A protein has these predicted regions:
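Transmembrane helix-loop-helix hairpins at membrane boundaries of multipass inner-membrane proteins
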Residues: 2-3, 18-101, 105-115, 194, ...
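Membrane-interface helix-loop-helix modules in multi-pass inner-membrane proteins
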Residues: 61-87, 133-136, 140-148, 385, ...
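Cytoplasmic/organellar membrane-interface segments at the starts of transmembrane helices
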Residues: 370-372, 429-494
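Hydrophobic transmembrane alpha-helices and their helix-loop junctions in integral membrane proteins
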Residues: 98-104, 122-134, 147-435
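Hydrophobic alpha-helical transmembrane segments of integral membrane proteins
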Residues: 5, 114-137, 260-263, 464-465, ...
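Central hydrophobic cores of alpha-helical transmembrane segments in multi-pass inner-membrane proteins
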Residues: 5-20, 32-45, 89-103, 120-122, ...
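Hydrophobic alpha-helical membrane-insertion segments
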Residues: 33-50, 170-181, 373, 377-385, ...
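Alpha-helical transmembrane segments and their helix-start/interface "positive-inside/aromatic belt" motifs
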Residues: 25-37, 161-171, 370-375, 453-462
Length: 494
């Protein structure tokens, strides 16, 4: 069996184990064992990948395997990874592991919740290892479907509305995506749906590219919170349970940026060059609009949701700059934002579970009441605003340096506008930290609250360690990513 198939096999075994498990201890045991196995497998894969590259293996995709699945449509179970895929698998495993501990005390219907959570995880892992267009689309759909139930059943607030809105908008994006994938396949003249074969043939007519590229980019862009198709994510974040928000913002939204880069831009480079300016304007709006909107929110989850729109917009903004440095920064931003936003949502969930409110106006003085959670919130905020030494700084600096490599007025003007989001982010983060953590607590109930439990500390400490590790030692992963974006970028350079 190919090693990459472990990332699909382990979730399948977890589903079987959860189905048979009786009692909360058995359910937790299955989840911790499975999540730990996925994390170990992702770390092992990272070392295997780096070892292969060090040994001189220059293949575009490593650890490839192809198994014919459905001959009439030339569909194969084709897997393979490069540095981008490895980074995304590592991120996904970290979020699944920490999300398991963040859901440790979830009630009711714990087994059913973890079944859907695991199915969502399987879709994410399967998507990142796939190099067949249809298989990628299949795992993409597997990742989306559980969100409806996870939010609609275990969510809070307007959860039914949020779940339906999310499902309808993402399924609408999937329709665009399916049309785009079929157009790419039939337009390329390829004998399979393997994206490497389609890229090597490089014979999709330009006129067709100009049709399929916008459809494919929009299909993935909806999931990446591209303006003006971002509204589903705001209500989805606000209503989702803690671990689902972590996986949703931390990993699921990254499928959008990954798909735009890996499929839309890689397979249709001429159209990407011709039409990128349209989407650059939209992503520039996403970056600034998300940051400004976060400034006026009073709900902790909505603040982080709008912040995610801004940061995910920066990912798409960077890949549309069509150069290696900016594209490397985009992948680093996916990693950084995935870790930061998972940390934020975990902390917000822990605070809400104690105070039963997410309204900033009702929170104050938490530093004295919950010092551990408060200090962790400060660290998350500093990472979000780009403090040197944490992951946000290296990702954003790489993006802006890469963006300025375009010498024309249009690209540099948009880059300057996008850079303003740094200042805006600092405004809402510092205001938020000052308001809820310091000052005088006026709610007597809050004075009796307890700090983080051991399971919450495990989740939070792991995420902080990753945020700090990426910020202080980014070279190894940025080098791994930079090598892998080069084949895509070389197609994009006119």
């Amino acid at each position: 069996m190919n090693f990459l198939s472990i990332f699909v096999l382990i979730p399948l075994l977890m589903l079987a184990g959860l189905w048979a498990a009786q009692g909360i201890k058995a359910i937790r045991g299955v989840m911790v064992t499975g999540a730990s196995a996925l994390l170990i497998a992702s770390v092992v894969l990272t070392f295997m990948y780096l070892g292969e590259r060090s040994a001189g293996n220059t293949a575009e995709m490593l650890f490839r395997a192809d198994t014919l699945w459905y001959a009439p449509l030339h569909i194969s179970y084709s897997v393979g990874v490069d540095g981008i895929s490895v980074a995304m698998l590592l991120l996904s495993a970290i979020i699944v592991f920490t999300g398991t501990f963040a859901s440790w005390r979830l009630q009711p219907l714990t087994k059913e919740y973890f079944l859907w959570f695991t199915l969502l995880s399987m879709g994410v892992f399967g998507f990142f290892i796939s190099i067949d267009l249809f298989t990628m689309f299949m795992f993409y759909e597997i990742a989306l479907i559980p969100m409806y139930l996870l939010i609609g059943v275990w969510g809070s607030g307007r959860k039914e509305y949020a779940a339906m809105k999310l499902t309808l908008m993402l399924m609408g994006g999937s329709a665009f995506l399916l049309i785009g994938i079929l157009g790419i396949y039939f337009g390329s003249g390829a004998t399979t749906m393997n994206l490497l074969e389609i890229a090597q043939l490089h014979n999709i007519p330009f006129a067709q590219q100009c049709i399929w590229f916008p459809l494919t980019f929009l299909g993935f862009g909806v999931l990446g919170a591209l303006f003006p198709f971002h509204t589903w994510s705001l209500d989805g974040h606000a209503s989702a349970p803690t671990a689902v928000s972590m996986l949703h913002a931390g990993v699921l939204m990254k499928l959008g940026g990954y798909g735009c880069f890996r499929i839309a831009m890689y397979l249709m480079p001429e159209a990407a060059n011709e039409l990128s300016w349209i989407f650059l304007i939209l992503t520039g709006i996403s970056v600034v609009y998300g940051a400004f909107s976060a400034c006026v929110q009073t709900d902790l989850k909505y603040i982080n949701a709008y912040s995610s729109v801004s940061h995910c917009g920066l990912v798409l903004f960077a890949i549309l700059m069509l150069n290696q440095t900016a594209a490397t920064g985009a992948i680093l931003q996916m990693l950084s934002h995935g870790l930061m936003t998972a940390l934020f949502f975990a902390l917000i969930g822990m605070i809400y579970g104690r105070t039963h409110t997410r309204d900033v106006r009702e929170l104050a003085g938490l530093m004295k009441i919950m010092p551990f959670l408060s200090v962790c919130y400060v660290i998350a905020g500093l990472a979000n605003l780009g403090l040197p030494g944490l992951s946000g700084f290296i990702a954003e600096m790489t993006i802006f340096v890469g963006s300025f490599q375009n010498n024309d007025v249009f690209h540099r003007t948009l880059t300057i506008i996008a850079c303003s989001s740094i200042v805006i982010t600092a405004v809402y983060i510092l205001r938020l930290v000052g308001k809820i953590l310091y000052g005088t607590c006026t709610n007597k109930h809050h004075l009796t609250l307890t700090d983080a439990t051991w399971d919450e500390r495990v989740a939070v400490i792991c995420l902080i360690a990753c945020v700090a590790g990426l910020g202080m030692a980014p070279f190894w992963i940025s080098h791994m990513i930079g090598e892998s974006v080069l084949p895509v970028v070389s197609q994009l350079i006119p």
